[in-house]
Regions:
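Short glycine/proline- and charge-enriched loop/turn segments
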Residues: 70-80, 123-128
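Conserved SAM-binding loop
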Residues: 1-73, 83-100, 172-177
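Short leucine-rich amphipathic alpha-helices used at interfaces
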Residues: 65, 71-72, 77, 148, ...
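A broadly tuned preference for mixed-charge, low-complexity surface segments
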Residues: 17-19, 23, 42-45, 84, ...
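A SAM-dependent methyltransferase catalytic signature shared across enzymes that methylate proteins
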Residues: 91-111, 144-150
Length: 177
């Protein structure tokens, strides 16, 4: 009803439509690529229009809370997951990748830092029951803030986490320049 022209394409055929787009969204994609920089360059050069919007969501790996939780509980680096995950990102590395390749980041936010539960003493890694319990607590945290009309604080919190390099996921909003 909004007259939106949207296409879904695999990375191997990004420009199959031989057209440019205003928005490209890559949610949990970049970490699966062997050469994420090549894909970002292709999007910048051939897929997005000038001033087009690129939205990327990736796991925030090797963050300080994750590493501290690993050390506290003497865990392996559970987030290293080949062959599925081939590339790993932090807020700094994601920012550098995009800025180096012709994008200006105008917003970055993180998601709830689940690794805090490890630091609280709840060893959820490898424990699906406890993992589900921790996930429910995160959901309740967000729902309760929203019910109290504190969404602005929640979003500011997630932006601050991204600035600190913390949070489970990173979502980046960048404009092609």
């Amino acid at each position: 009803s909004k007259n939106i022209n949207a296409k879904v394409a695999g990375l191997e055929s990004m420009n199959v439509f031989n057209m440019k787009f205003d928005i490209v969204s890559m949610i949990n994609v970049l970490e699966h690529l062997p050469d994420p920089e090549f894909v970002i360059k292709e999007i910048q050069s051939h897929v997005l229009r000038k001033n087009g919007l690129l939205i990327i969501d990736v796991p925030n790996e090797f963050n300080d809370f994750q590493v501290a939780g690993k050390e506290v509980h003497n865990l392996n680096e559970w987030w290293i997951a080949p062959p599925g995950h081939l590339s790993y990102f932090s807020s700094t590395s994601l920012r550098n990748l995009l800025e180096k390749n012709g994008f200006e980041i105008f917003k970055m936010e993180a998601s709830f830092p689940l690794e805090m539960f490890l630091l609280f003493g709840e060893k959820y890694v490898g424990d699906p029951i406890l993992g589900k319990s921790c996930h429910k607590k995160r959901i309740n945290f967000e729902l309760n803030l929203k019910k109290q009309a504190k969404e602005d604080k929640l979003y500011a919190f997630y932006e601050a986490l991204a600035e600190l390099g913390l949070g489970r996921q990173l979502r980046c909003y960048a404009r092609k320049i």
